[in-house]
Amino acid sequence: MIDKSGYRANVAIVLLNKQNRVFWGQRRNRTSWQFPQGGVDTGETPLQAMYRELHEEIGLRPQDVEVIASTRDWYKYDIPDSLVRTKEPICIGQKQKWFLLKLKSPESYIDLDANDSPEFDNWRWVSYWYPINHVVYFKQEVYRKALTYFKEYIA
């Protein structure tokens, strides 16, 4: 869903392990790394989209995680001009609802090949703040906002 301003509705997932390290995935056939994320389909709530993306991208089901928190606001970022879709509807960026999850199941349940079009080639656990300086530059500010917002929920 792309709104009138050109922003695609999207959910992003920060998945914690027991040591409060976060899941960090390498995009398929690319050198870039990021958190799991994906679009909100028409008629879908952000929570429903989050669970769908969680399964599509890393193979986890609702029973494998605990939802700790979600952002109140949608965080927006613009994409570089070279990535802007010029066909209707024009997409200039994404607005994201963020979710903080805790992994309850063994990490062996993480399955990057859970669907026919995997999003990630590789993954690892990284320290909580690591992603801010290692995600693609145009996402850094939304990562900073989300991780700062969630910090109060981490024991």
From Swiss-Prot:
Q: Where is this motif: Nudix box?
A: 38-59
Domain of life the protein comes from: Bacteria
Q: Which UniProt keywords apply?
A: Hydrolase
* Entry keyword annotation includes Hydrolase: yes
* Enzyme Commission number(s) from the entry: 3.6.1.-
GO biological process, alphabetically ordered: nucleoside phosphate metabolic process; ribose phosphate metabolic process
What Pfam families does the database record attribute to this sequence? Answer: NUDIX
Protein name per UniProt:
RNA pyrophosphohydrolase
List the source organism.
Francisella tularensis subsp. mediasiatica (strain FSC147)
